[in-house]
Amino acid sequence: MAARMGVLSVAGFRAAARAGGLLARPKQSTAVVPCRTVIASSAGAILPKPEKVSFGLLRVFTVVIPFLYIGTLISKNFAAVLEEHDIFVPEDDDDDD
């Protein structure tokens, strides 16, 4: 019984391998990069520039604000470490004399 199961599993493995399910080479993926190859019409006229989509506010909210927040957190934690180890402790000296 066990030998029969082994034969069936080997036969199933070979059938799957032949079908391309197992032991198949992964397909090489090609990256799709937007590229404008046609710059002139068939009559020879230069085509107009493509429209540029501006992501002004979206860019500000997704890039600038989070990284400013992360930078302030890092600097605040670093200042706390410096004060904790007495490396830099601001003094309240009055030099008004």
Curated annotation (Swiss-Prot):
Residues 1-37 form a transit peptide. The keyword Membrane applies. Keywords: Calcium, Calcium transport, Ion transport, Membrane, Mitochondrion, Mitochondrion inner membrane, Transit peptide, Transmembrane, Transmembrane helix, Transport. One of its GO terms (molecular function) is channel activator activity. The chain crosses the membrane at residues 56-75. It is a single-pass membrane protein. Residues 76-97 are mitochondrial intermembrane. One of its GO terms (biological process) is calcium import into the mitochondrion. Its main location: mitochondrion. Residues 38-55 are mitochondrial matrix. Component of the uniplex complex. Essential regulatory subunit of the mitochondrial calcium uniporter complex (uniplex), a complex that mediates calcium uptake into mitochondria. Required to bridge the calcium-sensing proteins micu1 with the calcium-conducting subunit mcu. Acts by mediating activation of mcu and retention of micu1 to the mcu pore, in order to ensure tight regulation of the uniplex complex and appropriate responses to intracellular calcium signaling. This is Essential MCU regulator, mitochondrial. It comes from Xenopus laevis (African clawed frog). The lineage of its organism: Eukaryota, Metazoa, Chordata, Craniata, Vertebrata. The gene is smdt1.
